[in-house]
Amino acid sequence: MHLRDSTKDTLASSGNRDDDEIDDGQHAQFLDADTVDSEESIEAEPVEENEEWSDQGSGAEGSDEGGGYAQYIDPDDDIDENDEEGMEVSGNDEEENSDHEEVRILVLLNSGYITAWYILAQCTDAEIESVPYDKLLKARRIMRRQSARGHATDEEDDNEHESIEAKRDLAKKKLREMYLSSHSSSSKPKLPPTSSSSSFLASRERKNAPAVMSSRRPVSRLRQVVKPIQNAKARDPRFDSLSAGPVNLDLHAKSYGFLPDLYQTEIKQLRDQHAKLKRTEIHHAGPRAKSQQAAEIRDQRAHVEQELRRAESRQNERTRRERERSVKADFKKENQRRVDAGLKPFFPKKAQFQEALLRKQFDEMAQGSGTGSSASLRKAMDRKRRKDAQKEKKSLDAALGGGSRTDIRPMRHFSDAPRPHKRGRRG
């Protein structure tokens, strides 16, 4: 009786609402007072235009109780429950007219959606009391389930997302296991890439195998479309192998025979300039002179002296090379004469060649004109004598245990006498 009374009060209170609120699609709320312990508010969902309804012919037209009604087909209901309800509603043909109100209320409550609450509000107390108690309990259970389903929508979305991720991970795991099982014949199977392509490319089947690298290289933004033109290098055709072939020294000496005179003239001018600057430095730029003019004179004299030494060095090098060519030419002529005479050619050693060069040098000094040639020869001989004497002295000191050589120990070290200890050193 408590359930019927609460249902009656709820329908009566909901009937006072305006039709405008019904059109706006607001949900009707019902208070379920079945139990004494707790009270629950049940939300009813509005009717959608595209929902499926089936007209019931019995009592729809020509009935004394009022207009027709529509039945909502709920796909969530079980087949057994629908069959049982159909059997209870249509099982008794004799009480069909009397239980018309009961069937109408039962269908609306059984669907779980109280969409025609304004029709139920017009029912009398007798019509509400005629509904069986178990059907009211069933309607309350269905409405609770619908309400719980609406509140759990967000949780279901989260659970659905997590389930999708779990299924995806499970599929990846199965694919990997299938790949490993298919390549189980090899000793060290090559695993497919899991995290990144770089780690997969860096992996190798064997430690001695070459590293695998990607052939895709990024194109540089600074591309050199047109190559720069190389600067033309100047070349002298007189000494170029493309035009003149190998250099003929004899032909070159004959063609440029005037160059030695120019070299001698240049050296003479540098010597005169150096002597003049040296006299000027003595008179105007002494060692104590600190003026700017004195510094300029010193710098100019040092520069001319450096140029003179460089010119003399180049001239001495040219003279030495000319002397070597002359000595080689003499040996070549001698070998040609020996071959013509039927003798074997003579190939001098390095020491013999150096001796011939030294003899040639002294002959040139002796053949000079005037007293200067004899003086230069005498100076050269004295310089050679001093050099040889210094060599003999070093070799004699080394033999006696002195000198700068350390590979030969002194004679006194070979004596049997013990060496004296240093001061303060214990024996």
Swiss-Prot record:
Source organism, top-level taxon: Eukaryota
Gene Ontology CC terms, in alphabetical order: 90S preribosome; nucleolus
Annotated coiled-coil segments of the chain: 261-326
Ranges of Low complexity composition bias in the record: 180-202
Keywords per UniProt: Coiled coil, Nucleus, Ribonucleoprotein, Ribosome biogenesis, rRNA processing
Signal peptide as annotated in the record: none
Record field: compositional bias (Acidic residues): 34-54, 74-99
Biased amino acid composition, Basic and acidic residues: 296-341, 406-419
Single GO biological process annotation from the record: maturation of SSU-rRNA from tricistronic rRNA transcript (SSU-rRNA, 5.8S rRNA, LSU-rRNA)
Disulfide bonds: none
Keyword S-adenosyl-L-methionine attributed: no
Region (Disordered): 1-100, 146-165, 178-219, 280-343, 364-427
Cellular compartments annotated: Nucleus, Nucleolus
Protein purpose: Component of the 90S pre-ribosome involved in the maturation of rRNAs. Required for early cleavages of the pre-RNAs in the 40S ribosomal subunit maturation pathway.
Assembly mode: Associates with 90S and pre-40S pre-ribosomal particles.
Family statement drawn from the similarity comment of this UniProt entry: Belongs to the RRP36 family.
Name of the protein in question: rRNA biogenesis protein RRP36
Gene source species: Malassezia globosa (strain ATCC MYA-4612 / CBS 7966)
